């Protein structure tokens, strides 16, 4: 194996949206392949037809591309080891099923699901771990053939099970977990390798695929550890060398300390959700990569090239990786601050147009206005969709202040500051951020009010918010007429509250 070219695979099932955990698996395989100048294979594991979702494979491919992950072989681009969908490899699997049947390493099993469940219930009642019990125990070859013929005559469809040898230790040196081993009598007995509908089971198909596609390393989540001894059993039965395995820790919710559940709607954990927010793909890739992997140094912001250069599976954590939504938001925000402004403009404009705030084909003047708006809020955003809420004041009619805002400007000196500022703005012909800040300074000189007592009432009265971007830039984009309307409405509201 040491002399073989590095070939890894990401093999999703088309059963739903791309989860952050699966995205991490794809990223780690991608980084490992690129770091070692190897090959990344995309394989669609759609053998379980009952669980497949229509369009699921296409969705996986689209979201992987959005994350900036590309591959060298796959169902969309082909390659020398195809087909790359399990549903198109049924004849290949059948060849090896037949081989194991002929060699006596596998057999037809006719036990019904009802019989198997009754067997498991009995074992549980006896305090025994549920496992399959060989149904032909003590029978001769002729008796087995007769029993199978009778079952077929009744219309029963068989599965195919592989023999698990007794007293065998299945062990491997995991590049993440270290040395792992399982005794053959602890893995549930002879397991199914072909279902009643003729399709292979996961633990059989994955071995055939990995071997024939010459996969050198299998990097996957540690929920697959219990599958590995079963797969090693298939490798041994077929006389094949197994790849190197590396099992990455599962992801937990940092808030609860429990395994991240796909049903937990309080956490954004599907790549499609980030695409809908119109996040840049780089921070999603960064945050996914940092889940369970510690790079050299203190930096948490990397380019793709830096990630590829640094990636080493030896630095993968043996402890569960905590998914921290706030951390991901922070990483997104760091990228927003340095993102290409034209790219950011395109993304944010799309959000504003979707919300009906900007027309489909804005005139050059309006386009420049949107550019200034996006630049003004870039440092505050983690996702460009946030521009819709952040900039509402620029697209709505003047509204009354909230109770909290009124309480803030009911304090002494707020009204005099607002009245004087309105007078200073009245004098302005050139309504620019620089001139507006000059008007604020003039208000300070005329009233003697300064600091927070000056700036907070003016910010609230003009922008209808206690926080926000630079107040001069914000008012310039609003325009003088809108700002004056806000000031008039604020003074009216103060009068109604008895503040003169």
Curated annotation (Swiss-Prot):
A motif ('KMSKS' region) lies at residues 259-263. Catalyzes the attachment of glutamate to tRNA(Glu) in a two-step reaction: glutamate is first activated by ATP to form Glu-AMP and then transferred to the acceptor end of tRNA(Glu). ATP binds at residue 262. It holds the Pfam family tRNA-synt_1c. Belongs to the class-I aminoacyl-tRNA synthetase family. Glutamate--tRNA ligase type 1 subfamily. HAMAP family: Glu_tRNA_synth_type1 (MF_00022). The keyword rRNA processing does not apply. One of its GO terms (biological process) is glutamyl-tRNA aminoacylation. The gene is gltX. It is an enzyme of class 6 (ligase). It catalyses: tRNA(Glu) + L-glutamate + ATP = L-glutamyl-tRNA(Glu) + AMP + diphosphate. GO terms for cellular component: cytosol. It is found in: Cytoplasm. Its EC number is 6.1.1.17. SUPFAM superfamilies: An anticodon-binding domain of class I aminoacyl-tRNA synthetases, Nucleotidylyl transferase. The keyword Transcription does not apply. A motif ('HIGH' region) lies at residues 12-22. Monomer. This is Glutamate--tRNA ligase. GO terms for molecular function: ATP binding; glutamate-tRNA ligase activity; tRNA binding; zinc ion binding. Keywords: Aminoacyl-tRNA synthetase, ATP-binding, Cytoplasm, Ligase, Nucleotide-binding, Protein biosynthesis.
């Amino acid at each position: 194996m040491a002399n073989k070219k590095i070939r890894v695979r990401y093999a999703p099932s088309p059963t739903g949206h791309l989860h952050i955990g699966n995205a991490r698996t794809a990223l780690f395989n991608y980084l490992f392949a690129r770091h070692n100048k190897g090959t990344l294979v995309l394989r669609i594991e759609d053998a379980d037809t009952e669980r497949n979702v229509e369009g699921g494979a296409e969705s996986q491919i689209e979201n992987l591309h959005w994350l900036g992950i590309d591959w060298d072989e796959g169902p969309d681009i082909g390659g020398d080891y195809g087909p790359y969908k399990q549903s198109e490899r049924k004849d290949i699997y059948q060849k090896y099923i037949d081989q194991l049947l002929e060699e006596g390493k596998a057999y037809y099993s006719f036990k019904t699901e009802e019989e198997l469940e009754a067997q498991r219930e009995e074992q549980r009642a006896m305090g025994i771990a549920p496992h399959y019990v060989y149904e032909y125990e003590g029978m001769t070859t002729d008796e087995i053939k007769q029993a199978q013929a009778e079952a077929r005559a009744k219309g029963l469809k068989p599965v195919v099970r592989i023999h698990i040898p007794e007293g065998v230790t299945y062990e491997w040196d995991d590049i993440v977990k270290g040395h792992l081993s399982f005794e053959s009598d602890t893995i549930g007995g002879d397991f199914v390798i072909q279902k009643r509908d003729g399709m292979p089971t996961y633990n059989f198909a994955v071995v055939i695929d990995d071997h024939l596609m010459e996969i050198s390393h299998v990097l996957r989540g540690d929920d697959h550890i219990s599958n590995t001894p079963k797969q090693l059993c298939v490798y041994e039965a077929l006389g094949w060398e197994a790849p190197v395995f590396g099992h990455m820790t599962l992801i937990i919710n940092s808030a609860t300390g429990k395994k991240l559940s796909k049903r937990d709607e309080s956490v954004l954990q599907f790549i499609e959700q980030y695409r809908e927010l119109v996040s840049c793909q780089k921070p999603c890739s960064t945050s996914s990569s940092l889940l369970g992997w510690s790079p050299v140094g203190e930096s948490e912001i990397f380019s793709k090239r830096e990630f590829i250069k640094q990636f080493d599976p030896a630095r993968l954590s043996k402890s569960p990786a905590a998914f921290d939504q706030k951390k991901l938001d922070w990483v997104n925000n760091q990228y927003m601050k340095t993102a290409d402004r034209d790219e950011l403009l395109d993304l944010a404009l799309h959000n504003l147009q979707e919300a009906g705030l900007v027309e489909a084909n804005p005139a050059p003047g309006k386009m420049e206005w949107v550019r200034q708006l996006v630049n003004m809020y870039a440092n505050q955003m983690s996702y460009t969709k946030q521009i819709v809420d952040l900039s509402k004041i620029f697209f709505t009619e003047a509204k009354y202040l909230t109770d909290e805002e009124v309480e803030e400007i009911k304090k002494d000196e707020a009204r005099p500051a607002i009245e004087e500022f309105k007078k200073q703005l009245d004098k302005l012909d050139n309504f620019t951020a620089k001139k507006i800040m000059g008007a604020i300074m003039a208000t300070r000189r005329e009233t003697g009010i300064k600091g927070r007592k000056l700036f907070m009432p003016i910010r609230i009265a003009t922008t209808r918010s206690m926080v926000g971007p630079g107040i001069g830039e914000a008012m310039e984009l609003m325009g003088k007429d809108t700002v004056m309307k806000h000031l008039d409405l604020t003074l009216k509201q103060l009068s109604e509250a008895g503040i003169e």
